[in-house]
Amino acid sequence: MRSNYKQITKTLAITGGLFLSACNGGGSAANNGQATSGTSPTATPTTVVSTQRNTASTSAGINEWPNYLAMGTISQGLTSSEPTSQKIDAIFTYNGANGNGDPGLIETPYKIYNMINMAKTIKQNTGYSVNPNIVEYQWQLSGGWNTEDVLNQDYLVKHLFNLAFLASTLQTDAYAATGTHGTILLNPDLLGFIGNTQREADIDALNIQVNGAVSQVSCMMTESFNFNNAPGCTYNWDKQPITTTGTVKDLINWLKGKTDNYSAGQAFSNCVESYVIKQCASKAANNQLPQFTSNFNGWIQAQNYLVHNYGPQVNLGWHMNISATPGGGWWVHEGKNAVTPYVNQVLSLLNHYSVFSGTYKPDFIYFDRYGADDYAGSLADNAGQTLVQNQATLYNDQDWDNFLQMTKQISEGLASGFGKAYVPVMLWQIPAAHIQTNAEKIESGINAGEEGSAPDYFFGDPALNSSLNNIADWINLGVGTLNSKYGLCAGLTASQCLTLNNFNWGHSDNAKLQAAADAHVFSILWGAGGFATAVWAIPGVSFPDNGWMANTLNNYYTNRKQPLN
């Protein structure tokens, strides 16, 4: 999820685990979201590619991603303020103005173009393709239960248009610039929230007018419009009139030729909102489009279809939390026997809604654990300790072993409906803070007081000795004694928890990178929307670490690239 500290402390003090989650069982088998003769007529897609996309590349990953375990980071797509010579395989950001799907609004697309440009610049400087990943919310449940995103028809149409336009833009603009067609990360926290809060009955009762919305979106995406003197169709501060005709894609290209990406995006959103939507609202329904069931399953299928149709070479992933059961994310601290019971509940939820077994399938599943460092010591007023005690964020080696075993079991458990041996896995928003030593000094703007174990687990850090007796003193002081929900680590300090299993955090081998590949992980994207370290520091988004993570990845690319299986 995109982190917000006030939201974190308020919500997770209640749920007692990582913010969102997933299932307590899905009940009986559900329709896969395609309308049948018992619901509404089935039609053949008019412009869609084959319903079964090729989801496997020549490697064990997916198309246009490397044949080794890829690495990525959060970015704002700003070449003026972020490094552009750091080797990286992928960058990600949240689409729209507010990063939450902009409910009820046409999203401004300027971030899409900024990310494509950022990836292009890094590719030019490093010589390697960079995959721009865009997070797209169609239903934002990170902040709690609401149904307006799917039951308010205006919201529904705008969300689906935003997704279709994102897919189309990546399809047509990304490849020449970046060497890939990009990736869409769909609906963080949605499925996890449903399972965590046991909302399946509420979800199953929803009547979502999917077909009318898809028909209107098809009109908005394909019709030609006369934008001359159209209401709301102006650009720049002085409201210059838009003087062009064509599709919405022609509109944004015309605007980009007149002004900067940000101003063009604002003008595009206003024009589509004020004019294009109204032109298509009165159009008769297009019955030549695929027909979907008017429920949650049909809504899922409609999103997959729109990406397949408008971005046939764009990769698509659906998200799952590790807190997808009523107990939240604390299960990960209960030892290896806690994995399979959790997995079984998640698989029940995913199968109930045919997320990976419908006619239109995503390309991969992506997991996060929570968008904050294990101990966010940089937060004021002891908020870092509140976070680590409320959010189950402090991980030792057994916790990461459990995490990878979870991904492997879910990936393989979805195989039958997916039609392949497993569903490829992305690890997303993994915090890049490391276990700091006493030799590392906290300096404002250079190195923040953040602690995390993920990079040390996967890559190791030769600066750490086997007993961790050189761990920075402020880590144990800041974390305090871990509470009873920490299971095997309950009552321990941070360093005691980290050394509980005698794991060598100073290793320099690829054993855990291989374990990730064995769990069908094709990429790890580092950093998050707030309170997490990333590959590089972004003011207000990610913390500085004196170049530790960037140097670690440089060594990985030079000496240790992990092949996929």
Positions of predicted regions on the chain:
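C-terminal motif of bacterial Sec signal peptides marking the signal peptidase cleavage site
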Residues: 19-22
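N-terminal carbohydrate-binding/catalytic regions of secreted carbohydrate-active enzymes
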Residues: 64-173, 504, 509-511, 532
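Active-site groove signature of glycoside hydrolases
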Residues: 170-206, 234, 251, 262-282, ...
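An active-site-proximal structural segment forming one wall of the substrate-binding cleft
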Residues: 150-186, 207-234, 240-241, 258, ...
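Substrate-binding cleft of secreted/luminal carbohydrate-active enzymes
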Residues: 58, 62-77, 353-565
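Aromatic-lined carbohydrate-recognition surfaces of secreted/lumenal glycan-active proteins
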Residues: 187, 296-339, 367, 419-435
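Substrate-binding cleft and catalytic face of glycoside hydrolase catalytic domains
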Residues: 95-99, 114-155, 182-206, 214-225, ...
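Bacterial signal peptide processing site
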Residues: 24-27
